[in-house]
Amino acid sequence: MAASRLALLLLVLAVAAARHALPAAGSDAHPGYDGAEDTCGVPAAAAAAGRMEEYGGGRILDITHAYRADLPAFAPGAVTGPVVRLRDSMANGTLYNLSELKMECHMGTHVDAPGHMNQGHFAAGLDVDKLDLDLLNGPTLLVDTPRNTNITAKAMESLNIPKGVRRVLFRTLNTDRKLMWKKGGDLSYVGFTEDGAQWLVDNTDIKLVGIDYLSVAAYDHLITAHVVFFKFPNIILVEGLKLDDVKAGIYMLHCLPLRLVGSEGSPIRCILIK
């Protein structure tokens, strides 16, 4: 109990410091398609219509992007997805509706396991099924990063995140630019530089790093920043978070990946509770 109170106190301090068409098979609600490899779904605007983003009178905030057909790909020209296929349809005479899902494990809101960019961890079997659920669930701090820079060592230092804070969600210019709502990949997204990642590892107790685009690492530091984070197996990266219209501050975070044995990544459902 004392440890929990201390963690919450540290988060309070951190907030103060950090302020600176198979047509017959498909419909608008349940899309279908006639080619096994075709992407199918409703447009983003239509998909968003009627979707719940808050629950419990605004107490619970869903910070997971819907897995819609026009999710952004990481890089321009990359395969987009996920692909949802209504394989069996009652509208076509079957006794049930049955969909299939085909997607990359690093699409949309997702988690990186340590083996994503560390072969030693991958060979040791450190997959998403072995991620620490205690770390994925608990008090978290949502901060706004400086908007004129990647997350460098200088930017990290300016956030004044105190020791003891284990989970931080970083909202960046990516949210302002609504990059997760654009189908085409955009390599000018904001992320951690190598020195920013190293500063976090060396100077904080943060073990869960969340960010608002498909990669926690800036494109020019794509490999090197990941290597810094994954040098040790106790840091979890959650990417592609939907942080639009969420106030900076302290929340209870709950994130649950799929139990994909042998996979270095997984779709993940994340919510914040005020």
Curated annotation (Swiss-Prot):
Distribution of this protein across tissues and organs: Highly expressed in leaf sheaths. Expressed in leaf collars.
SUPFAM superfamilies: Putative cyclase
Residues spanning the signal sequence: 1-18
Transmembrane segments: none
Record GO terms (molecular function): arylformamidase activity
Principal location class: secreted
Transcription listed as a keyword: no
Protein name listed in UniProt: Cyclase-like protein 1
Family membership: Belongs to the Cyclase 1 superfamily.
Keyword annotations of the record: Extracellular matrix, Secreted, Signal, Stress response
Any one cellular-component term (Gene Ontology): extracellular region
UniProt-annotated location(s): Secreted, Extracellular space, Extracellular matrix
Listed PANTHER family: CYCLASE-LIKE PROTEIN 1, CYCLASE-LIKE PROTEIN 2
